[in-house]
């Protein structure tokens, strides 16, 4: 993805040396911040993976959140490696693994967007048709959907790496254009569906004829979707636009494009803290409890008065 690599090799005339120097300084500062922040998000996601994978009984939504944590970890890992190589000025080494880092980054982003959309849809279904959802929903739906989304999310970046790679001399203009159109269309579909079901869910909870009790799971999902709509979708939109306008990329990168990438990186780190915040607050106050109990409460699908929880 040219989105974060043009500053590595771009040069400019002397008359623009000052603006370019400022741009490079900003770029390096953002990478230093990424090296500092990304490991925090990676550790938080590892904690989520450990407890949801081995310590807590899974349900439909915990399976999705588990896979979402994997995608967030992959994104942060790829991004932190890129930032480390830039800060250490290992540009030669980065030249050879750039395509792999870009593939992992977009793979993780597309999967994260896809799984968040599915979570929003299922949350909407569970509220609008609770009896059908809890009684008739196939048992292994979550596992099947996750496998399909992993495969589909890997397909587009893998095809781009195969057909659009200059490094491996496999660039095919016609195929590359088709792949970009299809992947861009898929992202647009995800954007529209996510926004639509999020709006339906909000209206159903706040304006429905019957009062629907809000659960911690609803709050957790709502916060994640809100942050994705604010910080995640701009990253995807810019990626789509960038695929069709790379001639003046240096100017755009120096302006705001890499800011979008790093803001989304920070957003992923914040996402991991949502579970701990939602799970640890009770009656407007933070409660002292184990991490396992905090995560259990964060994905609790029943209201507190009906869930039988015995927090301190």
Curated annotation (Swiss-Prot):
- Give TM regions: 32-52, 68-88, 107-127, 141-161, 181-201, 221-241, 260-280
Membrane topology listed for this record: Multi-pass membrane protein
S-S bridge residues:
none
- Could you read off the lineage of the organism from its UniProt record? Eukaryota, Metazoa, Chordata, Craniata, Vertebrata
Q: Which InterPro entries match?
A: GPCR_Rhodpsn_7TM, MRGPCRFAMILY
> Where does the protein principally reside?
membrane
Family membership: Belongs to the G-protein coupled receptor 1 family. Mas subfamily.
Enumerate the subcellular locations listed in this protein's record, separating them with semicolons: Membrane
Taken from the record's topology, the Extracellular segments are 1-31, 89-106, 162-180, 242-259
Enumerate the GO terms in the molecular function aspect: G protein-coupled receptor activity
Q: Name the job this protein performs.
A: Orphan receptor. Probably involved in the function of nociceptive neurons. May regulate nociceptor function and/or development, including the sensation or modulation of pain.
Q: Does the keyword Transmembrane apply?
A: yes
**Cytoplasmic-facing ranges:** 53-67, 128-140, 202-220, 281-312
The protein's organism comes out as Mus musculus
Tell me the protein's name: Mas-related G-protein coupled receptor member B3
Keywords in alphabetical order: G-protein coupled receptor, Membrane, Receptor, Transducer, Transmembrane, Transmembrane helix
- Is Transmembrane helix a UniProt keyword of this protein? yes
What do the Gene Ontology cellular component annotations say?
Answer: membrane
